[in-house]
From Swiss-Prot:
Main location: membrane
Family under the similarity heading: Belongs to the VPS11 family.
GO molecular function: protein-macromolecule adaptor activity; zinc ion binding
Annotated protein name in UniProt: Vacuolar protein sorting-associated protein 11 homolog
Length: 952
């Protein structure tokens, strides 16, 4: 332990003398024992007084004994003070319990119990439990007095005497409870130290005695630590104990006269008997140690010191046993007592001097350690003071900077590793990049990855370090065993840039980075078939995405296989399972194993199409089992893959034809594109191939299941000047005028006549357009004109005068061409005129007759000669009703309607409806003009409206 570093972590000062009114002061007390607690130093003196010293060193006292106070102890849990003293010289000692919270009329604490000990032997020490259920007193003759009672209620207190082996004086007493016992009083173990032995007594087992050590300790050498561990300071070492015996020890040599536990420190006062100054430098050997007391707030309470004259110096050392350093060292001429309170240690000298040791704050201690470059001690100190991780990391950084400046790069990186998570990594990385310490840098970045604190840049740097060091083994270990502690994409990039394509492929496969896997296969290795095989192992979404991205490249290199995969993808895609061996990695050579080829070709797809349809149910069940029970077809939209066939038109045709055959695609783009491909002219095509393509195109157009866009298709056939397609689409769209126009533009007279005959039923005006065309044609079209006039005459499409005006535009048209037409029309007109005159005379006669009847009814009487009722056909009798229409009825047969003849009511009603309808039609202008436009003879329509009186 001689290599422990020494520091001055305490400030020492002499306590100034503060005198009371009676002249007493702390320095003038004849101190016999000390303790502390509840914010006071408690001192027993030789006059029997117990003195309480406050923080300003003011003293308040009360008379506790008539003679001297030997021992005192302040309880921690209650404000009770226990003391041992004498009222008579040479008499038995008296144990008293004081309640410091209550006072008598003299303002003195109340003594709640006074127990006179049965033995008139010097009391060396005593201890008690906090609940006062057990009080143990140690005597100089080797006897122990055990008091177990309710000191507040029991009238008689029994004292049990136990003798220790060899009748050795008792030098220390203490309790520590066992963990298995719930009650401290029931399960407490009494720890007894004599000058020759260390003994335990199990109070729960009839004070069963167990000797746990054959070496004891002197007065003042025993104490209990804050955690309840017994400590014995011997000349060879400091020993810790537990219930079973010795625990750890610290080899501090030298005689220890007094010990104290202060916070986490062990305070030792003593001297070195061998004058080696190992533990107590500067101590002078001399005199003989007498049995002295130690007033302590922990552990046993020792007997009063009997100071003998000596010339040796006492040396005080304060040890931090956890962090292993000496926090303070100081010499004193004499030391009679030591205790602590208010965060300070108080040293009482026999000469009346009192010294106060106050611990420096942690920051000051750390600064001191930094100046002395004791960084490891600083780290331990910061941890023991429960500094946060950030503050501790600052200490590690300081330590690392110190080692780095000294050139100890390995040691520096060890300290920097402890700052991970607190210190910015770039601070460390920059240092070792500048110094070209790649090995150290690699260690640091590895640690960043292990703690999941690495960024993509860190991964890049680490892999670059591996590649720069050509440390393939570490590179392989990193990518093989690391579980999510690095950025995968960055690792793939670095391996790819460094030419480690097999490692990059492994990472991409292991972490399902499909895009990177395919990019390496296609762009770096040109393994097109393997790439396509890999795509087929992916689920539908990934396969769809990657074929859209890399399909163009794959179609250019392996068109048949790629087209086959696309056919599957767009119909009923199911991933294949033949690529599992892809991730197998040979660590010696690190090569990707050969996988089974699973590429689908167009031939395979088309040949198996019918079989798949026939066995759809069985396949569906199998597919469900192989694909996580997916109960629906996964298929892509074929129109989204058209662009990848930009340089492979023939394979695009096959792909689209297959999609059309499936008949389950609603996109018109598929059909439009296929039609365009059929019509495209290719210089490499033979005439037979062109004819076959046009035949396919016509079959495609006429197929009722085709879902092409008609307008788009019309543009295509027009652009490619495909007559059959143009005429078919015109007909399908009922664009009859465009059909006529097409024949006119191509001077196809026969086609024009045929079109008029075919579509003239639906649109008679086609003949009129044909007549206009032939009339303006410079060629001889007399036969065609005759044909047209025949059909115009048959349908009576236009007046003869208009026909003559149209034909007059062609100078080549002779009268012979229209001779038959004019003769026929004049004959028809003459017949129609005669017919109209006959009808006019008939209407005039009927009108005159009606006027005569009206006049007769107005001017002459009407004779009713009916003898039978029209309703019941019985003879008329009174009362009866006669109408001007010559119908007669019984009044009883008419009922309530006597104003209108029932027999004529229907005809009258129809006439009224006609008149009402004509009146309504007078306001329906749109209907009139619509009828006028659709009528072959507008004049007839207007005349008819005039005849009805609608226009009146």
């Amino acid at each position: 332990m001689n290599n422990w570093k020494r520091f001055t972590f305490f400030d020492i000062e002499t306590v100034k003398q503060v005198e009371k009114e009676d002249g007493s002061s702390l320095q003038k007390l004849s101190i016999t024992c000390t303790t502390s607690g509840r914010g006071s130093l408690i001192i027993g003196d030789a006059e029997g007084f117990i003195n309480f010293v406050d923080r300003e060193f003011g003293i308040s006292s009360f008379q506790a004994y008539q003679q001297s106070v030997s021992l005192i102890y302040q309880l921690k849990e209650r404000n009770f003070l226990s003391s041992v003293g004498h009222d008579d010289i040479g008499g038995a000692a008296i144990l008293k319990i004081w309640n410091l919270d209550k006072t008598d009329k003299n303002e003195q604490p109340i003594c709640v119990r006074s127990i006179k000990l049965e033995k008139s032997v010097t009391v060396t020490c005593f201890t008690l439990l906090e609940d006062l259920s057990q009080i143990i007193v140690g005597l100089a003759n080797g006897e122990i007095i055990i008091i177990r009672a309710d000191i507040f209620r029991d009238k008689v207190i029994k004292q049990k005497i136990i003798k220790v082996p060899n009748d050795s004086p008792i030098t220390g007493l203490g309790f520590f409870p066992t963990k298995s016992q719930q009650s401290a009083s029931a399960g407490a173990v009494l720890f007894v130290v004599t000058t020759t032995h260390v003994i335990t007594y199990h109070t729960a087992h009839k004070d069963q005695e167990t000797i746990i050590d054959d070496e004891g300790g002197d007065i003042g050498s025993f104490l209990m630590s804050d955690d309840g561990s017994p400590i014995i300071a011997r000349s060879d070492a400091i020993y810790f104990y537990n219930v079973d015996g010795r625990g750890p020890c610290f080899g501090f040599t030298g005689v220890k006269t007094k010990v104290l536990w202060f916070r986490s420190y062990l305070v030792v006062i003593g001297y070195d008997t061998n004058n080696t100054n190992a533990l107590f430098p500067g101590a002078v050997v001399g005199g003989q140690n007498s049995i002295g007391g130690l007033g302590s707030q922990t552990g046993s309470i020792g007997s009063p010191s009997v100071m003998v004259q000596n010339t040796k110096n006492n040396v005080l050392n304060i040890y931090d046993l956890k962090n292993k350093y000496i926090g303070f060292t100081e010499k004193f001429d004499t030391v009679s007592h030591i205790c602590s309170e208010w965060g300070s240690i108080f040293i009482f000298g026999a000469d009346g001097k009192v010294f106060q040791l106050e611990e420096k704050d942690t920051q000051t201690k750390l600064e001191t350690l930094f100046k002395k470059h004791s960084y490891q001690v600083a780290i331990d100190l910061a941890k023991s003071q429960h500094y946060d991780n950030s503050a501790i990391a600052d200490v590690y950084r300081e330590y690392g900077d110190r080692l780095y400046a000294k050139g100890d790069y390995d040691g520096a990186i060890t300290q920097y590793l402890c700052t991970i998570g607190q210190l910015e990594p770039s601070y460390v990385i920059r240092k070792f990049l500048d110094a070209q310490r790649i090995h150290n840098l690699t260690s640091y970045i590895q640690a960043l990855h292990e703690k999941n604190l690495a960024t993509a840049n860190h991964t890049t740097l680490l892999l670059n370090c591996y590649t720069k060091l050509k440390d393939v083994k570490k590179l392989d270990h990193f990518i093989m065993t690391d579980n999510g502690t690095f950025d995968v994409e960055t690792a793939i990039k670095v391996c790819r840039q460094g030419g480690y394509f097999d490692r990059a492929l492994f990472l991409a496969s292991k972490h399902s980075r499909h895009d990177w896997y395919l990019k390496i296969l296609l762009e770096d290795l040109n393994e097109y078939r393997k790439a396509l095989d890999y795509i087929q192992t992916l689920d539908w979404e990934e396969a769809d995405k990657n074929l859209k991205k890399y399909g163009k490249q794959l179609v250019s290199e392996i068109p048949e296989e790629t087209t086959g995969v696309l056919m599957k993808l767009c119909t009923n895609y199911q991933p294949v399972q033949a690529f599992d061996s892809l991730t197998a990695l040979n660590l010696n050579g690190l090569t990707i194993s050969n996988q089974t080829t699973t590429t689908t070709t167009v031939t395979n797809v088309t040949n198996n199409n019918n079989q798949n349809n026939n066995s759809n149910n069985n396949n569906q069940n199998n597919n469900n089992n192989n694909n996580n029970n997916i109960g629906f077809k996964q298929k892509s939209a074929p129109e989204e893959f058209i662009h990848i066939f930009v340089s492979q038109a023939d394979w695009l045709v096959k792909f689209l034809e297959y999609m059309v055959q499936q008949g389950n695609n609603e996109s018109s783009l598929i059909y439009n594109t296929l039609l365009e491909l059929y019509l495209r002219d290719d210089v490499n095509q033979t005439d037979d191939e062109r004819i076959k393509r046009k035949a396919k195109a016509y079959e495609f157009l006429t197929n009722p299941k085709s879902k092409f866009d008609q307008d788009h298709a019309l543009i295509l056939v027009q652009v490619h000047n495909w007559k059959e397609g143009v005429l078919y689409l015109y007909e399908k769209l009922e664009l009859f005028n465009e059909i006529i126009e097409y024949h006119m533009e191509n001077n196809d007279y026969d086609g024009l006549i045929k079109a008029c005959k075919r579509y003239g039923v639906k649109d008679p005006n086609l003949w009129v357009r044909a007549l206009s065309f032939f009339s303006t044609n410079k060629q001889d079209c007399q036969d065609e004109i005759i044909e047209v006039l025949t059909n115009i005459d048959k349908e009576n499409l236009i007046p003869p005068l208009l026909v003559i005006q149209i034909l007059s535009q062609n100078k080549n048209t002779t009268l012979a061409v229209i001779k038959d037409y004019i003769s026929r029309r004049l004959s028809q007109e003459t017949q129609q005129i005669d017919k109209d005159y006959t009808q006019i005379r008939q209407y005039a006669d009927e009108t005159e007759k009606m006027r005569h009847e009206i006049n007769e009814l107005r001017t002459n009487s009407k004779i009713f000669q009916q003898t039978k009722c029209i309703a019941c056909l019985l003879a008329l009798d009174l009362p009866s009703v006669h109408f001007l229409c010559q119908h007669s009825f019984h009044q009883r047969c008419l009922g309530e309607n006597e104003r209108e003849c029932p027999s004529c009511a229907g005809a009258n009603k129809r006439i009224q409806e006609i008149k009402r309808s004509q009146a309504d039609s007078a306001n329906q202008h749109d209907q009139f003009f619509k009828l006028l436009r659709s009528s072959p003879d507008g004049f007839t329509t207007v005349s008819e409206y005039f005849g009805r009186g609608i226009l009146n």
